[in-house]
Amino acid sequence: MNLQTDTLLSGYKIIQDKDAFMFGIDAVLLSNFAFSSIKLRDSGLDLGTGNGIIPLLLVDKVVHITGLEIQEKSAELAQKSLELNNLEEKIQIVKGDIKNVQTLFAKHAYDFVTSNPPYMISEHGKENPADEKAIARHEVLCKLEDVISAAEYLLKPHGKFFMIHRPFRLAEIFNCLQKYKLEPKRMCLVSPFAASEPNLVLIEARKNAQSRLKIEPEIIVYEKPGVYTERVKAIYKEMALK
């Protein structure tokens, strides 16, 4: 492993492997999207937590947050990060499979669930199942329905599910959410530039909720190549990243 330790503005440190999948803007946008809707008394679970960035970004907003990660190296780094920050009482890292949440966690125990899942459909097993980056990007070890069914199992009645994904899969996402009684309540599209087609979508769904969807103003990431817009700069600042 090629490790580096980064310090967030909050003072928390995160250990990352430069040769593996390091956190990017997706995790920051998802954390901020959830941040505006969760409460201090809440407890949550992050499905596919990777190196634990989402628990680290949300830890001061909640009572407790658990990160579930199937890849052993990523889970170990997440555990080292929480120990480095003395956050063992507020964050728990569990090494396990999203498809096995029923054997790992109590049913309907969490106020919210977050997930930054693999976006791309696996191309008939072409991806290497041992490749950490392939696992993070493609549905090698879990599919969209696995993530959504796990969220339904974990959430309390009226609990909230926050996910970031690709807009081209929106119809599939909404169909699957409603299949598991998770009603889409809030959505925000994300585009790289003002003239670009959206390439990300943030979704909040609530368990057993009435049907009414709020579309939030689109997030434009870059003002010009390499320069974040004022809105994205504000998001990074709010999440104590820059």
Placement of each model-derived feature along the sequence:
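Class I SAM-dependent transferase core
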Residues: 1-38
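Short, structurally constrained coil/turn elements
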Residues: 8, 87-88, 181, 215
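General small-molecule cofactor/ligand-binding pocket signal
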Residues: 15, 92-94, 185-188
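Conserved SAM/SAH cofactor-binding pocket of Class I
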Residues: 32-126, 149
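Mobile active-site "lid"/loop adjacent to the S-adenosyl-L-methionine
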Residues: 117-146
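Conserved Class I SAM-dependent methyltransferase catalytic core
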Residues: 141-198
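SAM/dcSAM-binding transferase cores
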Residues: 198-242
